[in-house]
């Protein structure tokens, strides 16, 4: 009987059938239940022919504060968002989140995965705001695992000894423009580069696949 060989250059075999999706949110505070979600970006990943992780599809939305949302002025000053600027082109949560879900479900199908898992820097924050918005709009067919996540702050601490995004990027030789930080799209792009760099470095060091898996 021929032993089945696992192709580790396929993404579906790298994370137990999960598709990593890197996200970042910008908000009007720290409380996911009461404070407004103002910006959301997401990037999927794929494997190249050599089994290295690379960025794939992306989406980005400016989001209108939900009804009666709390707006913390200090948070707006920190992220530089002017919620009254018509040029933001902000859309409702009920538009942005289902559109992001469509992109993720499409990527899951393309990569032969079963479900998505959130990847983010200090991921509990982003996951909490996304889940709160999903609950507010009663979104259907959520492709994400309800509690599993990959936190790049923790992973970068392990790989590089740095937990701050910009410092981890510097150690990983990833260019980082501090003036563009706290834009959800830019931060997601840099977090994606960092996540891919860490996964690929582990591959180069012989850390995956395991030579003698039990």
UniProtKB/Swiss-Prot annotation:
GO terms for molecular function: 3'-5' exonuclease activity; magnesium ion binding; nucleic acid binding; RNA exonuclease activity, producing 5'-phosphomonoesters. One of its GO terms (biological process) is DNA replication proofreading. Keywords: Exonuclease, Hydrolase, Magnesium, Metal-binding, Nuclease, tRNA processing. Its EC number is 3.1.13.-. Its cofactor is Mg(2+). Pfam families: RNase_T. The active site is at 182 (proton donor/acceptor). The record marks 78, 125, 147 as: Important for substrate binding and specificity. NCBIfam families: RNaseT. Trims short 3' overhangs of a variety of RNA species, leaving a one or two nucleotide 3' overhang. Responsible for the end-turnover of tRNA: specifically removes the terminal AMP residue from uncharged tRNA (tRNA-C-C-A). Also appears to be involved in tRNA biosynthesis. This is Ribonuclease T. It comes from Haemophilus ducreyi (strain 35000HP / ATCC 700724).
């Amino acid at each position: 009987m021929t032993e089945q060989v696992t192709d580790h250059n396929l993404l579906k075999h790298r994370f137990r059938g999960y598709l990593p999706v890197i996200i970042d949110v910008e908000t009007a505070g720290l409380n996911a239940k009461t404070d407004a979600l103002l910006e959301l970006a997401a990037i999927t990943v794929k494997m190249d022919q050599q089994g290295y992780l690379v960025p794939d599809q992306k989406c980005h939305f400016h989001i209108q504060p939900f009804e009666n949302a709390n707006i913390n002025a200090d948070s707006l000053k920190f992220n530089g968002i002017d919620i009254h600027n018509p040029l933001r082109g902000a859309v409702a949560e009920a538009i942005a989140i289902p559109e992001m879900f469509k992109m993720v479900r499409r990527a899951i199908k393309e990569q032969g995965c079963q479900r998505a898992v959130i990847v983010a820097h200090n991921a509990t924050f982003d996951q909490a705001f996304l889940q709160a918005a999903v609950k507010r709009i009663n979104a259907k067919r959520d492709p994400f695992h309800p509690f599993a996540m990959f936190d790049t702050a923790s992973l970068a601490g392990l790989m590089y000894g740095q937990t701050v995004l910009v410092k981890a990027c510097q150690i990983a030789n990833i260019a980082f423009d501090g003036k563009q930080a706290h834009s959800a799209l830019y931060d997601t792009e840099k977090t994606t580069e960092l996540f891919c760099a860490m996964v690929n470095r582990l591959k180069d060091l012989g850390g995956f696949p395991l030579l003698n898996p039990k």
